[in-house]
Every structure is written in structure tokens, then in C-alpha cells.
Amino acid sequence: CRRACEKLMEDRRAGKQLKDMKGIVYYGEYLAKTDPLGANVPNPVSHVAYGYATQMCVLNPKDGKLELMVAAHDVGKAVNPLSCEGQIEGGVVMSMGFALREQYPIDENCKPIQKYGSLGLFRAHEVPKIKAIVVDKPGLNVACGAIGIGEITSIPTAPAIADAYFRYDGIRRYNLPLADTPYERKG
């Protein structure tokens, strides 16, 4: 947590060397201020978000297959830009599966009834071009300026793909995996 890192940095600024800090544990806690569920306030705060992400899907006009995914993510200061790009690409590919093919049926005891290989995961040769845009904003005064790049990479993918198909054929799709696409699994 950022507050623990700030305590560590206080020791570093005071002249402590890393080798002398071995075994020291730093604790920190952050509790976001949110409104209770159902609060009768004009603009309730239900959660705290640190990053922002947006994605766009481009379909091939001839066959309706994904041609390009553009994913822009505000990460604050990109401490490792190449790693950020990889995280974005991985999140997009994972969510393409959620959006278009993956099904994870379970039995009445919540036990999977399909093998991993038959879930509908995208294979490398099926993945479209992905343009990962790391929005790097230096100057934030927290955690070396980094905001983070994790789960947020997979959130905008399905809506972007659903919107691309709506623009392609005028059909709104409300369930995942999306029906009536070239990726729909038969049977």
C-alpha cells in the first residue's frame, strides 16, 4: 500500500541504506470514504477508482471478424512501459474470450463440467492486432506516480466489442458470450 511505501521512503530519505533495512516491516492502510449503499445523496460515492481505461474494436467489414483492438489506459507514471503494454494486451485477449466464445458451465455442485481446452479460449493465431496505448502522466505524488494496470485492462473489452457489432449489423447484444458473431460456438 502507498502509505507503507511512504514510511519506507522516509527511512531512505533519512539516510538508511537498503542493506540496513532488512527485516523491517512497514504497515499502511487506506480506507476510501464512500457513501452507504442506498444513500440519499445527490452524487453518491460507491467506490474509488484510480485508473481509467477505454477501448475500441474495429471489425473487418467483409466478414465481421475482429481486425483491431485499440486499448488506452491511464496508468499514472508507467514505471515499466513494456510491462504495461503486455498487461493491456493480456487483459484484452482474456476479455475477448469472455465477450465472444468462452463458456464455463458448472454442475449443481459448482464443479466445472468442461475441460480447460474446450472452454473457447482464443489461440494466438486468432488474436487480432492490439494497439496498446499507455497514457503516462508524470507528476502524481503517490507510489512513484504509478496508478496501476491490472483488472482494469479487461473491463472495457466486451462493451467495445458489443458496440462494434451493433454498428456492424444493428443488433444489440446483452449476453456474454455475444451471439450471432463469426466467433459463436456451435453446439
Annotate the PLM regions:
Residues 2-187:
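C-terminal catalytic domains of large/alpha subunits in multi-subunit enzymes
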